[in-house]
């Protein structure tokens, strides 16, 4: 039977509960345990699919097509276990399910209340389908005291009494701020946070304390005394230069030992952390550096590109180089020459996005990369803009555009109205809802034998990648574009949907309709990112 670890947060948001959960999951895995990680999000949206990138950050897409919180990306990257739609739930989804049952009459006329109906639904989600796992780590979004989070805290309070004694522990992630004028770390915010947590019936077993400096013994003693935890359970979570240094740091601080002790499990062998040590050595001691320009639409919110940033770092690990990122808002290129911004970079990456704002700037970035022989990686929207650039400037289709931006006489990119998923035909229309209606999740693609992209993937001709898009390149223009050098080297198995384009006579120019960054891991870098960084490294030696 699985044991449950609940990770809560206090004092301030954005302390890194998702990263802490992922790091602890990796440590337990390294001890030979099988782990599952889940995220509870208290917001009323059904999922983050229609939320602004500036408010939510990245939407992480799973193989089975769920649009989820970006923390699930941390879970996958640290443990290697693919997340599913059953690993993330929101208040909105819970309420939708409850109200559907109420309309159906499932509650037999009962008054529907937060307790017990909402809390029971949360508990059912937490404990469902956990057979075969040793530990289930559950992160509760937000901070203790948030009104919207109260049903979740009540549910995890109840669940300790529902399960056998000793099967549940609580870890509270908090902040110890340093006050320069006083010259000391302050424990009072943490004491108040734990007091709030205890007032709703939850006594934390472990305090994970974010800090930028060592915690003095006296402060540990004080936290243990006033928060009612053992002094050994006050774990120092020091700021790290790399997120991949966190598992080793947490182990050195005793987190995994304390977790096992809280469950009364005798630690037999130390965790096998050799692979973590190896990648951290590569990160700390690179043999070179490359600069990649990310020409995006949401560069003011780096979390909107979280998996992309990590995938590029994985490409750097694979090539033993540091990847430096130069963030450029694509709208800049609509009024200014891109050359001064891009002449010094070793590669250009144009990521996904939605809407007309900044689209022309992305087209200019693709043109610069093509004409100057700079490695170019276009992802989703970035591929579509590269195709429009080729149509306008190589094939002479001056009015080439996307119907996403409005009516156009030359629809190089258009709305997908139907596609095949498994054995079923999916259909969409312009009048449909926005939420949950895109082409989402893992789909197969067939690669052209002998193409550059096939070589990047190791010579295979069949791949599976995750998608999140509503628009697709129009195959009616395929022959004209190929006559001018832009090759369609990857297609859906039925030959209907273009998946990959490339230039054969360019050092490295690849556009993909899918999101390869979602499947990259520090120990298994995605081949496209490893190859792109390698091409950037070659380019860096030419200038």
Swiss-Prot record:
Report residues binding ATP: 14-19, 71, 238-240
- Pathway(s) where this gene product acts: Pyrimidine metabolism; CTP biosynthesis via de novo pathway; CTP from UDP: step 2/2
EC number(s) from the headed UniProt entry = 6.3.4.2
Activity regulation, in the record's words, is:
Allosterically activated by GTP, when glutamine is the substrate; GTP has no effect on the reaction when ammonia is the substrate. The allosteric effector GTP functions by stabilizing the protein conformation that binds the tetrahedral intermediate(s) formed during glutamine hydrolysis. Inhibited by the product CTP, via allosteric rather than competitive inhibition.
Detail which positions bind L-glutamine: 54, 353, 381-384, 404, 470
Q: Which family does it belong to?
A: Belongs to the CTP synthase family.
* Official protein name in the record: CTP synthase
Recorded source organism is Rhodopseudomonas palustris (strain TIE-1)
Gene name of the record: pyrG
């Amino acid at each position: 039977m699985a044991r449950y670890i609940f990770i809560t947060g206090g004092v301030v948001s954005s302390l890194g509960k998702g990263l802490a959960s992922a790091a602890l999951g990796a440590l337990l895995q390294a001890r030979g345990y099988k782990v599952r990680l889940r995220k509870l999000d208290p917001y009323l949206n059904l999922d983050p699919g229609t939320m602004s990138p500036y408010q939510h950050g990245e939407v992480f897409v799973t193989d089975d097509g769920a649009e989820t919180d970006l923390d699930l990306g941390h879970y996958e990257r640290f443990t290697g276990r693919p997340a599913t739609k059953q690993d993330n739930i929101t208040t909105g989804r819970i309420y939708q399910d409850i109200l559907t049952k109420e309309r159906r009459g499932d509650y037999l006329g009962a008054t529907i209340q937060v307790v017990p109906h909402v809390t029971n639904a949360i508990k059912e989600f937490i404990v469902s389908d956990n057979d075969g796992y040793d530990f289930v780590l559950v992160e509760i979004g937000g901070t203790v005291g948030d009104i919207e989070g109260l049903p979740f805290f009540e549910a995890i309070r109840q669940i300790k009494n529902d399960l056998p004694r000793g099967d549940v522990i609580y870890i509270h992630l908090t902040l110890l701020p340093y006050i320069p004028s006083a010259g000391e770390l302050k424990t009072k915010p943490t004491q108040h946070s734990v007091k709030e947590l205890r007032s709703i019936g939850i006594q934390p077993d472990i305090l994970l304390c974010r800090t930028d400096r060592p915690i003095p013994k006296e402060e540990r003693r004080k936290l243990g005394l006033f928060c009612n935890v053992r002094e050994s359970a006050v774990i120092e979570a020091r700021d790290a230069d790399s997120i991949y240094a966190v598992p080793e740091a947490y182990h050195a601080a005793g987190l995994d030992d304390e977790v096992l002790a809280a469950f009364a499990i005798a630690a037999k062998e130390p965790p096998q952390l050799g692979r973590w040590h190896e990648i951290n050595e590569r990160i700390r001691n690179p043999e070179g550096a490359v600069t990649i320009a990310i020409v995006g639409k949401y560069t003011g919110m780096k979390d909107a590109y979280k998996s992309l940033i990590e995938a590029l770092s994985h490409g750097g690990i694979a090539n033993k180089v540091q990847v430096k990122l130069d963030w450029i808002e694509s709208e800049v290129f609509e009024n200014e020459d891109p050359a001064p911004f891009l002449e010094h970079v070793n590669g250009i990456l144009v990521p996904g996005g939605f809407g007309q704002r900044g689209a022309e700037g992305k087209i200019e970035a693709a043109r610069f990369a093509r004409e100057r022989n700079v490695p170019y990686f276009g992802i989703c929207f970035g591929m579509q803009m590269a195709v429009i650039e080729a149509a306008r400037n190589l094939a002479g289709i001056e009015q080439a555009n996307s119907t996403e931006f409005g009516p156009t006489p030359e629809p190089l990119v258009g709305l997908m109205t139907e596609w095949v998923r498994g054995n079923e035909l999916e259909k969409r229309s312009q009048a449909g809802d926005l939420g949950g209606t895109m082409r989402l999740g893992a789909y197969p693609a067939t690669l052209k034998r002998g193409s550059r992209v096939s070589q990047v993937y190791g010579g295979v001709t069949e791949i599976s990648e995750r998608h999140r898009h509503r628009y697709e390149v129009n195959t009616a223009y395929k022959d004209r574009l190929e006559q001018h050098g832009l090759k369609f080297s990857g297609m859906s198995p039925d030959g209907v949907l273009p998946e990959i384009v490339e230039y054969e006579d360019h050092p490295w120019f690849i556009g993909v309709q899918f999101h390869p960054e979602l499947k990259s891991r520090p120990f298994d870098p995605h081949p496209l990112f490893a190859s792109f960084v390698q091409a950037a490294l070659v380019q860096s030696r030419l200038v």
